[in-house]
C-alpha cells in the first residue's frame, strides 16, 4: 500500500478581456504536452502570495500582483498523491507586450477563452485548471486579506 503524499501548490488565473493566460508544458508523469495556469509548489521560506507571484514570474516573465483569492481546490491524482491548490486571480490592466518565461519547462504561452481551451488538441493538465477558470467566470472574488501569514 503506497502512502499518500500531500502537495501544497499555488496557481495564478491570469484573466484579461475574457481570456486566460495558459502555459504549455510537458506533464512529468505522462510525458504529454498540456495546458496549465502558471502554478507550482510553495517553497519552505514563502507565504502563499509570494509563492504565486514567483510562479507567475518564472513561468511568464511577468511581474504582477493578485487582485483576489479564488479559493482552494483539491485533487487526488492517479499516482496516489493529493494536491491542494490555492488559486489566485490576476487581472492586468493591459495586455503584456511580451513574455519571457524564466522556466525552461514552459514551451509556449496562450491567451484562450474557455471554449478555445476546450477545443484545443492540448488538454488541460488536470480538472483543477478548469475548476479555477469556472471560479473566475462565476464571479468568485475573495479578499486577499483572508490570507494571513502565520508569523
Protein language model regions, located:
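Conserved N-terminal beta-strand and adjoining loop/helix that marks the start
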Residues: 1-21, 38-41, 72
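Conserved S-adenosyl-L-methionine
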Residues: 67-71
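Conserved Nudix-box catalytic region and its N-terminal flanking loop in Nudix hydrolases
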Residues: 16-58
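Short, solvent-exposed loop/turn segments at secondary-structure junctions
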Residues: 30-31, 73-77
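Unchanged
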Residues: 42-65, 75-126, 149-151
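Conserved beta-strand residues within beta-sheet cores
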Residues: 9-11, 63-66
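Residue-level preference for beta-strand/loop junctions
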Residues: 4-6, 31, 82-84
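Charged phosphate-binding loop/patch that engages nucleotide di/tri-phosphates or the phosphate backbone
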Residues: 130-151
Amino acid at each position: 500500500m503506497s502512502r499518500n503524499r500531500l502537495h501544497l501548490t499555488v496557481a495564478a488565473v491570469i484573466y484579461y478581456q475574457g481570456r486566460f493566460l495558459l502555459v504549455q508544458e510537458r506533464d512529468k508523469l505522462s510525458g504529454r504536452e498540456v495546458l496549465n495556469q502558471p502554478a507550482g509548489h510553495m517553497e519552505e521560506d514563502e507565504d502563499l502570495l509570494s509563492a504565486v507571484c514567483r510562479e507567475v514570474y518564472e513561468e511568464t516573465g511577468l511581474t504582477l500582483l493578485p487582485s483576489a483569492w479564488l479559493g482552494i481546490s483539491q485533487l487526488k491524482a492517479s499516482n496516489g498523491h493529493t494536491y491542494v491548490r490555492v488559486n489566485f486571480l490576476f487581472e492586468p490592466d493591459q495586455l503584456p507586450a511580451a513574455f519571457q518565461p524564466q522556466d525552461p519547462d514552459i514551451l509556449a504561452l496562450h491567451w484562450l477563452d474557455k471554449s478555445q481551451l476546450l477545443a484545443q488538441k492540448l488538454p488541460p493538465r488536470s480538472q483543477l485548471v478548469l475548476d479555477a477558470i469556472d471560479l473566475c467566470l462565476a464571479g468568485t472574488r475573495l479578499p486577499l486579506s483572508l490570507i494571513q501569514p502565520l508569523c
